[in-house]
């Protein structure tokens, strides 16, 4: 009997059944979906959680626009390991392990195996939630052409695809060479082209009023408008279309918006970003002789994506930090010289706010002259794997080398150079009254005064001077080497012992380098330095399958399974993963399986080495405030030992005292932590497989029922600032004191001992967990004149929780859509039906997403009882019809979202909202009914 290798084990066995829960999507499933990207199909599977990055949620990301990732069990993309032919694939996200599915040619895939549950012992780090193993086609002979075109009912979201796959096999059938070329194009979907998102809006929900959650306040325009908003001492004003001064009226007349002076950002935003892809792939198997051979896999993917959001919103505090006073005049040789570009109306209504002898003002303005903020991303991924495999004295062996590289070049427009803008804002009249920049050196460098007052007031020369094009260059490199052997050791009465063992080496490097202005925080944003890092790991593993009993009453077969992997990381040192399980075949029709596993995830490069990026937190409470010099508790002692606190106490009668400026003067940095340890996950799965061959009607049916539970107690999270403060001073935990920097002495109006920096860094202080049941059922057979196949997959989620810190209460997310964009319905299901009758074929896919409540923490903050505000369930139906013109030619027509089911109104301000879409586009279809037609030709 031929033995096969299935995801979840490295030991080939006669039965293609995994010891852990496994679901398989075939190439026929991919073809019936009409999907141009694998994520579109995978997200229909109920084991999948909310992806961190997709085409419909990445418009506002600073990088990774158009990337598509997967997230098993809602435990995070970084805890789902994506493999290609059982081997790792280079990441598509800098500093992370998440694979961009755009880089894998959909039409070159034979099947996708979804293994849920911890699998780090078998495959290494990151497989805490499970594994997505993408198996490419092999031994294909001939030519296959597939082309399609389609668009949405609204005339957008157009897509085009052409894919050519070819293969040739040697005369003896032992060697094969395959190639693939693919091109796909998916168009943009603009927020303004869907009624629900055409206007800026926000939820009307407020304290104690749950009934207002899905009532939209429209319009809810931005206070940063293209004509500017200017603040005097007692009023604020703006300009009309003719640049006449008028009062500010942000949203206009209630209900109609008439006379609004605010800005509608939805005119510029996208629901889905456009993505173009070119894909090249090749595989080959060359048999030296019947026992030994070589193989190779090559992939090159080039993708182009573009995000688009509203023009830059500039506030005077972006230019003059921290308070934002803009000088309306200059002191030159002791004389006050007015800026000639400042209107008299404003000049007459301002005073000296900061005591420097110069009148100043404040403003907000939308820099519409700059155009929209647009990021164009070109991403190239290359991967080559090669190796030897064969059989030696009854044992199978394989060795391989893999090299992968992802390069992303991003260029951005619409940003402003803060230093240039500051020079341009500080204008004085020259000898003939013409406005010039005050700073002589700036004038020599081409400074042009800028006028912000009114529509289109910025001249092309001024625009050129203050514009700051942005860039980001990221490079990810992966190198792998490994070898393994597998075979059988005879000797037990119940059969031979299956054994597999191997060694692996891996190197990961990543860098993300923004432009110099972004690094320095001089483009009106926070400083974002480069992030670079690398690590290597050496691993050994061993797996065994031991037959315990065979051909006994109620025991057709009983086997024990065990796997152990030891890793040695250059960053975290030694790691150990293991799993142990039982497979009990009671009868030919009934089988039980159970697995207990410990999986590890080493910290990724971002978590270890993210460079400090500046932030300005609000709402922090200093535990030391009010502590006295005579206090004897741990808090008092810890506070007095902090720099500057004793000085502060001495100046305030022995009590540590802070003022408002101290609270507003806190800055901080978000950074990685090179001292992180690997996180450990424990998983349990217990399952039942039933194939009721004795029942005539069900003899071709397969049923599986699997219970799963996963818990991570030392998860890597970015520690909350308030938690770090409390741990340092209240809990006497010095590890967290390193995140806090105090002023040793008073600086201006900032007190001695006040917090200067409160940082966020990654720590092993979090926790995650999930628990539930998976059910699958499948059947195929003759029905009427044709053949029918049916498959159902359902997941019931009992529990999903996260814990910010070890002593914090668990935040239960099952059945909720949360503030951190996790959508976790208790029930999700997918039903696939396919019928074939002669040359005619039809397939139907129904995807059900159960109801969810709004995040209980969000509702509690509004004094609303948890569970009282819910989003209803949604069912999406996709169909495809095929007609075989002849044996080699097939036409097909498909409709996605057949009944045009609308997404729920998850309005801005509610948890789960994706900016610019007024719903959760990671979960629900925000585009609507879509059509496509295609042609397949095989030769």
Across the structure, where does each feature detected by a protein language model lie?
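Short acidic/polar hinge/loop motifs at secondary-structure boundaries
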Residues: 87-116
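Surface-exposed, low-complexity loop segments enriched in small/polar and acidic residues
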Residues: 195-204, 238-275, 281, 290-537, ...
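Short loop/turn motifs that connect adjacent beta-strands in outer-membrane beta-barrel proteins
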Residues: 139-142, 171-174, 289-292, 391-397, ...
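C-terminal beta-barrel architecture of Gram-negative outer-membrane proteins
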Residues: 615, 786, 790-884, 899
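Extracytoplasmic beta-strand/coil segments of soluble accessory domains associated
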Residues: 14, 43-88
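C-terminal beta-signal and adjacent terminal beta-strands/loops
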Residues: 798, 847-858, 882-939
């Amino acid at each position: 009997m031929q033995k096969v290798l299935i995801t979840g084990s490295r030991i080939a066995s006669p039965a293609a059944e995994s010891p852990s829960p496994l679901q398989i999507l075939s190439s026929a499933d991919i073809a019936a979906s009409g999907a141009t990207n694998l994520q579109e199909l995978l997200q229909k599977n109920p084991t999948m959680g909310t992806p961190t990055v997709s085409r419909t949620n990445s418009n506002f990301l600073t990088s990774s626009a158009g990337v598509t990732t997967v997230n098993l069990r809602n435990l995070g993309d970084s805890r789902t390991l994506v493999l290609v032919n059982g081997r790792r694939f280079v990441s598509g996200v800098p500093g992370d392990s998440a694979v961009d599915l755009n880089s894998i040619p959909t039409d070159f895939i034979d099947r996708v195996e979804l293994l849920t549950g911890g699998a780090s012992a078998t495959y290494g780090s990151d497989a805490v939630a499970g594994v997505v193993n993408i198996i490419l086609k092999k031994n294909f002979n001939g030519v296959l052409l597939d082309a399609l075109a389609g668009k949405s009912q609204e005339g957008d979201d157009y897509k085009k695809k052409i894919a050519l796959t070819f293969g040739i096999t040697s005369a003896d059938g032992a060697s094969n060479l395959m190639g693939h070329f693919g091109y796909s194009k998916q168009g943009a979907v603009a927020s303004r082209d869907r009624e629900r998102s055409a206007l800026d809006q926000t939820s009307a929900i407020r304290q104690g009023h749950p009934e207002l959650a899905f009532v939209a306040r429209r319009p809810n325009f931005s206070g940063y408008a293209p004509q500017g908003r200017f603040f005097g001492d007692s009023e604020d004003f703006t300009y009309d279309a003719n640049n006449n001064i008028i009062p500010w009226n942000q949203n206009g007349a209630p209900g109609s918006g008439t006379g609004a002076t605010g800005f509608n950002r939805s005119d510029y935003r996208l629901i889905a970003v456009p993505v173009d892809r070119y894909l090249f792939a090749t595989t080959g198997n060359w048999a030296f002789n019947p026992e030994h051979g070589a193989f190779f896999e090559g992939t090159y993917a080039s993708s182009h994506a573009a995000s688009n959001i509203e023009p830059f919103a500039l506030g005077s505090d972006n230019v003059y930090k921290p308070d934002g006073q803009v000088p309306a005049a200059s002191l030159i040789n002791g004389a006050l010289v007015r800026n000639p570009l400042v209107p008299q109306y404003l000049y007459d209504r301002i005073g000296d706010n900061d005591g420097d002898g110069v009148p100043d003002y404040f403003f907000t303005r939308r820099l519409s002259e700059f155009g929209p903020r647009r990021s164009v991303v070109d991403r190239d991924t290359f991967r080559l794997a090669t190796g030897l495999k064969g059989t030696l004295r009854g044992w199978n062996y394989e060795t391989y080398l893999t090299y992968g590289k992802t390069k992303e070049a991003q260029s951005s427009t619409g940003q402003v150079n803060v230093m240039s803008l500051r020079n341009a804002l500080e204008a004085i009249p020259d000898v003939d009254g013409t406005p010039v920049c005050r700073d002589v050196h700036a004038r020599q460098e081409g400074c042009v005064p800028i006028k912000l007052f009114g529509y289109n007031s910025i001249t092309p020369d001024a625009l050129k001077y203050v514009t700051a094009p942005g860039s980001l260059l990221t490079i990810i490199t992966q190198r792998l080497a490994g070898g393994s052997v597998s075979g059988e050791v005879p000797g037990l009465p119940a059969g031979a012992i299956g054994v597999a063992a191997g060694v692996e080496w891996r190197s990961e490097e990543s860098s993300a380098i923004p432009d110099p202005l972004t690094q320095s925080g001089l483009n009106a944003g926070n400083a974002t330095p480069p992030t670079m890092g690398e690590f290597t790991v050496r691993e050994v593993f061993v797996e065994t399958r031991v037959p315990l009993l065979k051909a006994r009453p109620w025991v057709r077969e009983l086997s024990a399974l065990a796997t152990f992997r030891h890793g040695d990381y250059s960053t975290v040192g030694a790691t150990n993963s293991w799993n142990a399980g039982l497979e009990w075949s009671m009868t030919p029709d009934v089988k039980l399986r159970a697995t207990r596993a410990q999986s590890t995830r080493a910290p990724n490069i971002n978590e270890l080495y993210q460079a400090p990026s500046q932030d300005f937190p609000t709402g922090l409470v200093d535990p030391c405030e009010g502590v006295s010099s005579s206090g004897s508790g741990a808090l008092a002692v810890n506070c007095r030992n902090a720099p500057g606190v004793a000085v502060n106490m001495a100046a305030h009668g022995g009590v540590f005292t802070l003022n408002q400026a101290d609270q507003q003067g806190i800055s901080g940095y978000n950074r990685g932590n090179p001292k992180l340890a690997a996180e450990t996950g424990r998983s349990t799965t217990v399952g039942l497989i039933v194939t009721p061959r004795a029942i005539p009607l069900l003899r071709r049916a397969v049923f599986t029922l699997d219970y799963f539970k996963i818990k991570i107690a030392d998860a890597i999270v970015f520690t909350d600032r308030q938690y770090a403060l409390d741990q340092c001073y209240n809990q006497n935990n010095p590890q967290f004191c390193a995140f806090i920097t105090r002023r040793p002495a008073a600086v201006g109006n900032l007190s001695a001992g006040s917090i200067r920096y409160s940082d966020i860094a990654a720590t092993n202080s979090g926790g995650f967990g999930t628990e539930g049941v998976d059910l699958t059922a499948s059947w195929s057979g003759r029905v009427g004149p044709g053949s029918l196949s049916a498959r159902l997959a359902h997941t019931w989620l009992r529990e999903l929780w996260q814990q910010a810190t070890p002593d914090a209460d668990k935040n239960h997310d099952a059945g909720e859509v949360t503030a951190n964009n996790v959508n976790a319905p208790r029930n999700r299901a997918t039903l696939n039906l396919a019928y074939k009758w002669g040359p005619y074929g039809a397939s139907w896919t129904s995807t059900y997403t159960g109801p969810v409540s709004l995040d209980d923490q969000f509702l509690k903050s509004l004094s609303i009882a948890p569970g009282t505000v819910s989003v209803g369930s949604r069912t999406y139906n996709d169909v495809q019809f095929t007609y075989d013109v002849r044996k080699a030619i097939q036409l097909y027509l498909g409709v996605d979202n057949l009944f045009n089911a609308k997404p729920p109104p998850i309005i801005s301000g509610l948890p789960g909202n994706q900016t610019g879409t007024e719903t959760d586009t990671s979960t629900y279809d925000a585009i609507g009914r879509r059509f496509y037609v295609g042609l397949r030709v095989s030769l």
